Every structure is written in structure tokens, then in C-alpha cells.
Regions:
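Conserved P-loop NTPase motor core of helicases/translocases
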Residues: 16-17, 21-25, 69, 77, ...
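Interdomain "pre-motor" coupling segment immediately N-terminal to P-loop NTPase/helicase cores
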Residues: 1-17
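Pre-Walker A (Motif I) flank of P-loop NTPase domains
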Residues: 46-52, 75-76
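Walker A (P-loop) phosphate-binding loop of P-loop NTPases
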Residues: 57
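Active-site cores of enzymes that catalyze phosphoryl transfer or operate on phosphate-rich substrates
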Residues: 13-22, 39, 52
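Conserved ATPase "switch" residues in P-loop NTPase domains
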Residues: 72
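Motif I (Walker A/P-loop) of helicase-class P-loop NTPases
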Residues: 61-69
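N-terminal pre-P-loop "Q-motif" helix
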Residues: 28-48, 62-63
Length: 140
């Protein structure tokens, strides 16, 4: 990929191109500590990609959920990736609890039970036209 958005994001992730940040007034989140609040504001200012990294127990999930929730007030969708299925499930659960429409992508056998109904496969299976689509597939 050259000269398109995918190529641009690839180059940013590889570190060959610097990411940009917008100038925004900081948003106050009184329920977060100062480090979490600063991280959420940094995510909100990111033009392209934001990474939240830290040791266990430092509030990354809380920070990410708030950042994602706030970003969804400004953008139509957000792609969230994590190092493990458990981390993705945990973030997804917290977002669902806040009323966010989550589509959980990944191997359904590695998704926890609570998040199964949010997987692509389950949504497809629950679609009203699924039986008809399945019968067409079986015939071919």
C-alpha cells in the first residue's frame, strides 16, 4: 500500500512517520486520577493512533474505556486492539456496560461467554435472514 490512509497508518505504527496531535482544551474527569486524566486527554488529542501502556494494576482499562467512550462522542467508530483476548473482553464488557455498541472480532472459542453475543459470528447467526442465507450456502 502506497499513498493511501492504510500506508500512512502503517508508517506511523512503524515509526517512519510521526503522528500528530490536535490542540484541544483538556477535559476534566474527576473520577480519574491525574495520570489517567492526562492519558485520556492525550488520546483525545491524537490524530491517528494512541497507545496506552503500563504495568498491571495501573488503571489502563479504566483509562482506555473512558478514552474510547469520549472518542465515540467525536468519531463514528474506534478500533481497539489489545495484547490478549482477556484484555479485549474486559474493555468490551466495560464499554457494553456504558451502552456502547461493540462488535467483538476474534476467534469465538477465545471470547468469554458474556461477550459471545457481541461477536460478528453471533450477530450474523441472529440476523433475520440467516436461515435463508445458510440454505443458499448449503445448496451451493
Amino acid at each position: 500500500a502506497k499513498g493511501n490512509r492504510l500506508a500512512e497508518l502503517r508508517d506511523i505504527l512503524l515509526g517512519t512517520v510521526k503522528t500528530g496531535f490536535r490542540e484541544l482544551y483538556p477535559v476534566r474527569f474527576p473520577w480519574l486520577n491525574s495520570t489517567q486524566e492526562s492519558a485520556v486527554n492525550k488520546v483525545l488529542c491524537a490524530r491517528d493512533v494512541a497507545i496506552v501502556h503500563g504495568p498491571p494494576g495501573t488503571g489502563k482499562t479504566t483509562t482506555l474505556v473512558e478514552a474510547i467512550y469520549e472518542t465515540l462522542h467525536r468519531e463514528p467508530q474506534v478500533l481497539v486492539c489489545a495484547q490478549s483476548n482477556m484484555a479485549v473482553d474486559w474493555i468490551s464488557e466495560k464499554l457494553v456496560d456504558r451502552g456502547v455498541n461493540v462488535l467483538r472480532i476474534g476467534n469465538p472459542t477465545r471470547v468469554n461467554d458474556k461477550m459471545l453475543s457481541f461477536t460478528y459470528e453471533r450477530r450474523f447467526e441472529n440476523h433475520p435472514l440467516y436461515p435463508e442465507l445458510w440454505s443458499i450456502r448449503v445448496k451451493n
